[in-house]
Amino acid sequence: NMAYLCMLHSKIPHGYVKAVHAEKALALPGVYGVYHCLNTTDRKYSHYRANFDMNVADEERVFNNYVRFIGDKIGAVAACDQETAEKAARLVEVEYEELPFSIGFDDTLEGKNCLPGETAIKDEYELEVGEKPEGTNGLIEVCSSMEIPRLHHATMETHVCVADYDSYENMLTIYCPNQSVHGIRTVIAGLLQMPESRVRVVKATMGGSFGAKQEWFLEPVAALVAKELGCPVKLVYSRAEAMTCTVVRGAMRMNARGYYTPDGTLKQIYYDVTLDAGAYIGNAYDYVRALAGKPTRGYRIPYMHYHSRVISSNTPVSGAFRSWSAAEEALVMERQMDAAAEKLHMDRIALRLKNVAHSGDEDKKLHLPLEDIRIDDALSMGREKFEWDKLIAEDR
């Protein structure tokens, strides 16, 4: 007696749902119900919450009447089979009140999409590592910058969830591929006002995640409808839905300013990073701050100043992504090294060998040893195996 769901997603980037007309859908044989932002709970949650005492903002509902991006969840149709659910979903008509929106860094920083009382910058963070120097006399300044676009995980298996509610036992069981059974239980119990002991989450075998299934989008929907209908409910996202309606790696704008001695030794570096969290903040504060801990693990940096900010545009939501900012940090740092090598007229590998961290060095942020990292050995071996010096000589 499984019920199948088809989602109703926002067709506008920013605004309010004023009315949902579901009469045609409900008249279709085999349709069990149309659940949406105007006839279900208005309790809020965070898709990033992993336990009840996490300091994260509860910004979203199971179905949102205040929509913040194209693809935001506004409702779901439950039916006897997937084909009927999809057919009924196409019959639902939604009225919106549209608001100004922003999809890029500049418009968002200017507050184009801000409501009265809101600020464009949602969070700022600063960190200093090492002893601040007197100045930059005798040092050569090198500036580099880059923008990194959103990136989707593209897991083999898209997002899927099955929820089953036993009204006699008041027991809700959720089956889904996920990275935190306790996080899902915490969120669902709070939303449906159930004791956590009455919510059971079964982690299914995952067809890939890479962070995509560390946050909760389908589970609240399936749980709510299963409890309403009192039968098993299945929700499967298409590839298009997974790419636009779950999480992506957030877009970043990163600037680095390094100061070097004439022989190429890095003495100071200043980072300025902007992370676009997309429509909801989620893990953005933690994610951009995690980046601050990465530079001193790869390079010997006597002094680092890190400044970051988080903005929220009307775009797909940023979330966990494999390596949690290490790839972004590597890109901006290696771009900085290439720019420095060009300005100082040095070989790119030679410059790196002069500055990379060595086994046993101290991570200046954590004050812990880096152990057996051997970056210098890897560079030297690569230089030899790829005949780097020969290639450079031929290029000249």
Please tell me what each predicted stretch does.
Residues 49-53, 57, 122-161, 167, ...:
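Glycine-rich loop/linker segments at domain edges
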